[in-house]
Structures are given as C-alpha cells and as structure tokens.
C-alpha cells in the first residue's frame, strides 16, 4: 500500500499499548476456526482464536485506574520517559464485542468500523493465534492462502486489510524482558511503514519525542518505529483492491529512530530499510476498470473467495498470484492493459521493475531486495493480521482514487479507482459510514492447489 499507518484510529480515552498486564478486565479471545488442507477434499479444522492489538487497549497505572495516555497526550507524571512509562503502566483485557465491535461465529470474523460504548472506537487490528499466548506463524512459500470476504458495506475511504507481517510469535516477550504482556495481549506489531504511532515498542514506551496528531484526536507520532517485512494479501473496499509485497532489508521485527525510519510517518519516505510502497497489483490501476466492483466481474456486492499463491520453495519466492471464486466460478486475474505490461497478471521481479518504469514510480522494491528478500522474511514464518481502518494521512486515495491528487488521471498508474479525490476524509467516513463492517471467513491454507 502507498500510505499505510498503524490502525490506531479514534480510540477510547486512554487506549494505548503497554507491556505489563492489569486486572480490571478479563482477557477472553474470541474463538475462530480455520482449515489446513492437503487437497480440496481433505481439510482439517483448526480451533483458533483472535486477539486485538495492544494499541487499542485501556492502559493505566499499575496500582489503580489513572490513564497513562488520554486523547493523544501522555500522562507526564506516569510517563516522563520511555523506560519509566513501561514500568508504571499496564494494559488491560478487552471487551471485544461491546467496546471494539469484534465478533466471531464459527469460521467467521466480523469487524465493525465504529463502535459506541462508554467511548467511541474506530476500526481494529486483530491477529490469529496458535494458542492463547502465541500467534500462529504461516510458512507461505510453496503454499496458498484462501479466505472468503464480504466487504459490500465498505465504501470509499475504508480499508478491510488482511495481511502478513514478520512479528515475533510471542509478541516480543523473549526479546524484551520488560514486555510481560506478549501475544496474549496483542503486543509486538511491526510493518513496512515502520509505524511510529505505536505507544510501546520493544518493551518500552514511545513517549520521548511524541507529537500529537493534528487531525486524529487519539493518535500521534513518537521517536521510535517498529519495522518488519509485510505481505499485503488483501487491501480493499467495495470499490478497489490491491495485493502488495513489502520487503525490508532486515526482515524480522526491529526498531528504528525518528525520521531514519522512513515510511508514512517520516519526513523522508525512503530513509528506512523497508519498502513503504511495495510492488502492488491493483486491477483498476493495471487498466482493467470493469473487473472489480459492485456488479463487475468480481461483484463486491456479494461475498467471494480470494486465493493467493506463493510460488517457490524454501526461502526462494519467485511469483505471487491471485485468483477469485464467486458463485462457483473461478475468476482469473486479467493481464494488464498497459502496453509494456500486457504480459503480466501476477507479481514477479520482472513485472515490478517494468511497472515502476511504466508508472514512473521510485523502485524501492528492487532496492530492498525484491521477491528474494520478501521470501527471506516469509521463510521465518509470518503472523496473520485481519483489520479495518481509515486513513488520516492520505484518505485512502492511494487505493481507490487518483493519487497523487494533482496528477493527470490519464497518466499510467495514477488512477487507482473511481472514488473522488475529495473522498475518504476520516471525519466524514466515521460519521456517514459508522455502521460499515467487513467479514473474513472460511480461511484455508495448504500447498498450492490444495484449497480449491
């Protein structure tokens, strides 16, 4: 994605990430089943569960109820610096349905955009668990990942994102001794934007250098970022979609400092060791303007299946392809219609290089190692993220409109969808589309050809 940020959104007062655990709210993970397959007729059901990211949770002093963070400002008494903040603050359990609009039923996970309880929650980010204390790690190379999605209620400006990142399975507990909450409480997030809006990173606060956001009442940017490789299997609303690999020179989770992080949060986008843009496949951007949308070939007014295949073996990733199933019909990805890209309908290193030239984009993907480096990250196992968010940085225009907004829409690659360049303003969508919901279901995983 072009301008991804960590999904803090407009959170409940005091919601923040911390590394110790409080006792005010019991933590009970919603249960969710998924399947491992050896062939389309031979799948085993796994009993899984999901956890919400710690950045959404209520964080308070370890001995009481005093918020460590309110609105987009730290409590300077409890959090005068990074280390003291981690020592003083704990995060608490989550009421998934009432507070965050997160529910499960069998193999389905439903995420509601705006949930009103004692406070107002916007969006969510969840992880699939292997156990109550460990994230499940997926070995993607040589395998395929399939899921059903209903995003008929997601308009311009929203993003139902399902993706993988190279987080630590334990949420960073083994690496960082001050992190005693771990995966059970959703700690350890990282991605290719090296997000700096995380309140705690590597077991310490992100207090020092914190600047409150000017357009998000509950977010800000700190002096630390958390980086790792990212594979966006699915970023979409009912108007447009994209899938995008983002390699990092160091694939595993690691921290960075201030503007050296690069990405969305920094003054120099390409200053870090990760590729914030990635190599994206968006059918509309590739010239197929009637392929995806309400009433189109892939009809987003109805549920459909997404199957993503990761070609290669070991740590060698050679190609990423994607097809769809709807109404019992298999729908192949169409080839691009741009003159220099007509031979492509999947992501390869050759495609990525040609696309960057055709679209006049900076080729950071190749600079950071391309599919070879993406494969290096995948080989260590990746955590599944399922989320719903809006974009306080670019209004999601990089996904569903003309971007940059002052670009000639007829120029190759600049028009990514039909949404207006004035659409996607968070204050607008949080009001007009509060009831928006995305449902992910029927996850299947196995060797290429094994799920369908």
Curated annotation (Swiss-Prot):
Pfam families: Glyco_hydro_7. It catalyses: Hydrolysis of (1->4)-beta-D-glucosidic linkages in cellulose and cellotetraose, releasing cellobiose from the non-reducing ends of the chains. One of its GO terms (molecular function) is cellulose 1,4-beta-cellobiosidase activity. The keyword Signal applies. Gene3D superfamilies: Glycoside hydrolase, family 7, domain (2.70.100.10). GO terms for biological process: cellulose catabolic process. Its EC number is 3.2.1.91. Glycans are attached at residues 75, 335, 360. InterPro entries: ConA-like_dom_sf (IPR013320), Glyco_hydro_7 (IPR001722), Glyco_hydro_7_sf (IPR037019). Keywords: Carbohydrate metabolism, Cellulose degradation, Glycoprotein, Glycosidase, Hydrolase, Polysaccharide degradation, Signal. The active site is at residues 230, 235. Residues 1-18 form the signal peptide. The biological conversion of cellulose to glucose generally requires three types of hydrolytic enzymes: (1) Endoglucanases which cut internal beta-1,4-glucosidic bonds; (2) Exocellobiohydrolases that cut the disaccharide cellobiose from the non-reducing end of the cellulose polymer chain; (3) Beta-1,4-glucosidases which hydrolyze the cellobiose and other short cello-oligosaccharides to glucose. Belongs to the glycosyl hydrolase 7 (cellulase C) family. This is Exoglucanase 1. The lineage of its organism: Eukaryota, Fungi, Dikarya, Ascomycota, Pezizomycotina.
